[in-house]
Amino acid sequence: AIISLMLLVSCKKNTESVDVCIYGGTSAGVIAAYTASMEGKTVLLVEPGRHLGGMTSGGLGYTDIGNKFVVTGLARDFYRRIGNHYGKFEQWIFEPSVAENIFKDYVERGNVEVLYSHRLNEVKKDGARISEIVVENSENPSPKTNKQIRAKVFIDCSYEGDLMAHAGVSYTVGREDNSVYGETYNGVQMMRGHQFWDPIDPYVVPGDSTSGLIWGVSHDVLQPIGTGDKKIQAYNFRVCLTDDPNNMIPITRPDN
């Protein structure tokens, strides 16, 4: 009887039921969690890492924006809260740490439970519907510490789409051809703007095409403009830079 009671307590400890479970603490994940909570739903936000905000708090502090007036709702609210931090009405360029604190404030104000450092391990379905997911500790995975999460609605807000893929739903990867939806800027595009200000010679020996291409320049022939493919955007490191002499630290060359 004692053993059965211990197993029951352990099972309850590692099982949680909510209205909405959101996988991925990206900016979209945080806002989705906050919105659901403000609508009166019980919410669990699962983040595989230790930080909230995704790219917004991970180094992408320069917002790609054309017409700011198309930004509304909680996105606009976010940028105005950023602005408030800097003593302005709104702010589109910011420090990642400031963005993360704003996202933390959203989950705190929304009373959203956040499960950090847990990644997807298994998806259980009832027919075509997800009934439960199992997550494991990202830093020290062990079946003993796995957690079962049951929810009426699951939302995948991760960048990789792991929950989506494990659930077996249809999806596509890459960029579609212009012809698929009768659009203009899909697929292969020759960059007419956003180029380096200073020309970079592509050859190992500048000006000598026989010397080969420098690292990162592809030998592939460019396909016609608008052609679709299965390629995804490159993964990059993003860092904060400054032109303020009082805020500078040297960028040192690695030993290798």
Q: Where does each model-flagged region fall?
A:
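Glycine-rich, N-terminal phosphate-binding loop of Rossmann-like dinucleotide-binding domains
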Residues: 25, 137, 158
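Flavin (FAD/FMN)-binding glycine-rich loop and adjacent Rossmann-like elements that form
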Residues: 11, 141-153, 157-256
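Conserved beta-strand-loop-beta-strand element in the redox core of flavoprotein oxidoreductases
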Residues: 124-148
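Mobile, glycine-rich extracellular loop/lid and propeptide segments
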Residues: 27, 34, 119-121, 133-135, ...
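Bacterial Sec-dependent signal peptides at the C-terminal "C-region" and cleavage site
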Residues: 5-17
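Sec-dependent signal peptide recognition
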Residues: 1-3
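Conserved N-terminal/central alpha/beta ligand/cofactor-binding core
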Residues: 35, 41-42, 47-126, 172, ...
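Beta1/beta-strand and adjacent pyrophosphate-binding region of the FAD-binding site
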Residues: 14-28
